[in-house]
Amino acid sequence: MAGERPPLRGPGPGETPVEGPGGAGGGPGRGRPSSYRALRSAVSSLARVDDFDCAEKIGAGFFSEVYKVRHRQSGQVMVLKMNKLPSNRSNTLREVQLMNRLRHPNILRFMGVCVHQGQLHALTEYMNGGTLEQLLSSPEPLSWPVRLHLALDIAQGLRYLHAKGVFHRDLTSKNCLVRREDGGFTAVVGDFGLAEKIPVYREGARKEPLAVVGSPYWMAPEVLRGELYDEKADVFAFGIVLCELIARVPADPDYLPRTEDFGLDVPAFRTLVGNDCPLPFLLLAIHCCSMEPSARAPFTEITQHLEQILEQLPEPTPLAKMPLAKAPLTYNQGSVPRGGPSATLPRSDPRLSRSRSDLFLPPSPESPPSWGDNLTRVNPFSLREDLRGGKIKLLDTPCKPATPLPLVPPSPLTSTQLPLVASPESLVQPETPVRRCRSLPSSPELPRRMETALPGPGPSPVGPSTEERMDCEGSSPEPEPPGPAPQLPLAVATDNFISTCSSASQPWSARPGPSLNNNPPAVVVNSPQGWAREPWNRAQHSLPRAAALERTEPSPPPSAPREQEEGLPCPGCCLSPFSFGFLSMCPRPTPAVARYRNLNCEAGSLLCHRGHHAKPPTPSLQLPGARS
């Protein structure tokens, strides 16, 4: 059909990706830069906001509002994470790029991208159980096997993430989501906006600390002190989550006892734990909260210990046959055992199948628990003005260029012996062939054919068993071997998503309903007080970098040499506010002249135009437009 755009697809078997006329490659025969492939894949997975209805606000965060939506064509229920701040655009793109490359049952599944009024919004799977924080604060009974399974799910997700060479940096009970299915619970890890490549500190080389980011209650002591830190910071955050699971208390120091050096107050914490708690489970939580990072075990060993604890746990007894204690342990009763982490607790009664924290509701925020007459409650986060009591979120620079995170395995870790039960043999993971590539590792992947753009039964998403380990070193001299590009799992009629055009600009309104705001209202972008003189304090330069990101410079003369990795403008009218220069590693400004085929939203060039309809259908319920 004349005037119709050919379908977007990746290179087929035996094909070598080359640039078309006027492309960034400078002519036919040159390989396409990875930024172009990432951009084209992002355009192919775009959705319009008015493709969804039944919008219900289910939560809000520091940068976004979360809506439960239903796709009109497929009827699939998803979660739309609408970005509220234009300055957070690059962090959102980093999160989308990373989630699009992760495939694991305990990692939140990425469904697609939605663009509305110049803002990028992520579409993820819907978790009907809410957050782990909401589950623990509810009166829902949770037996010890259920809690151990939740902890194992989170540990397996983080083990997979660390194996890809990336660590989370913002692991909290707010960012762990729960799915209810078949009378049980499954936990997944989400919110990868602060994820970073695992650093490698070599002897003799200059060691520059990473930025101080995260939620203070879950941040490791070395992070709060501005020291060097790595993936072991996630282990400390996991230990705080385990303490929340064991005692069913919030991470607030008014409920979860902490020391003045941001550690866990072990004697005071044990007063919150009933005698029925499995001792290895408690010791694992204490071990993960070690002050010394080298003393914390990696997640490969943590998952092994959790699996062994589950195997050794006695069979649960029906609730009707459970003997109730005469005087159940409450938050203000019990003595404080001394002797450090190695002090033993009374042996648990094998007849008990549920935690004693299920016998009464969690404490209300108005009545913090008491830890004994001889203990003083300490909130170390209130002693520093920059932390503001811990009810904030520390950020690096929300507007810095989005550097894709390479998904490569980190260097071998030194095994750390856990002072717990005897460990089984190490989990043997099958080795997968290493494929070397020159593209940005976290760039979205292209669908091979046009079938993902049309409604109908689509292929199932690629599972973890079919993926490859990526060895994406920028200095690799080997070209990428030709082969079929893996398909991007988009939601069609099953778990995929359809390809549509860009978003319209009409405003949206949400269905009235209860709003669950689980995050504090304050956001801090700078580093802790007193670090302004340090040369590595990158967080204090956020405002100049934000202005630099929005600035557009004229394009270079045609005769100037061009590099292969250069920033490309978005070809779609929906992405005109974007520069998309941060998709590339090239620091040169974005050219002002569009060099690709125009992807405007005229009816003649749409991938899926509406036929003879005079007007596009209007949504019954609308989402509020993002502020640009």
Swiss-Prot record:
The Gene Ontology CC terms held by the record are: centrosome; cytoplasm; lamellipodium; nucleus; perinuclear region of cytoplasm
Compositional bias (Gly residues): 20-30
What residue spans carry the region label Required for interaction with YWHAB? 421-526
Can you say where in the cell this protein is located? Cytoplasm; Cytoplasm, Perinuclear region; Cytoplasm, Cytoskeleton, Microtubule organizing center, Centrosome; Cell projection, Lamellipodium
Q: Which residues carry this modification: Omega-N-methylarginine?
A: R338
Where are the stretches annotated Required for interaction with PARVA? 529-626
Keyword Ribonucleoprotein (UniProt): no
Q: Which UniProt keywords apply?
A: ATP-binding, Cell projection, Cytoplasm, Cytoskeleton, Kinase, Magnesium, Manganese, Metal-binding, Methylation, Nucleotide-binding, Phosphoprotein, Serine/threonine-protein kinase, Transferase, Tyrosine-protein kinase
Q: Where is this region: Disordered?
A: 1-35, 330-376, 424-490, 538-568
Biased amino acid composition, Basic and acidic residues: 348-357
Stated regulation of activity: Activated by autophosphorylation on Ser-215. Kinase activity is inhibited by SPRED1.
Residue positions where Phosphoserine is found in the record:
S215, S439
Signal peptide start-end = none
What is the protein's name according to its record? Answer: Dual specificity testis-specific protein kinase 1
What is the protein's species of origin?
Answer: Rattus norvegicus
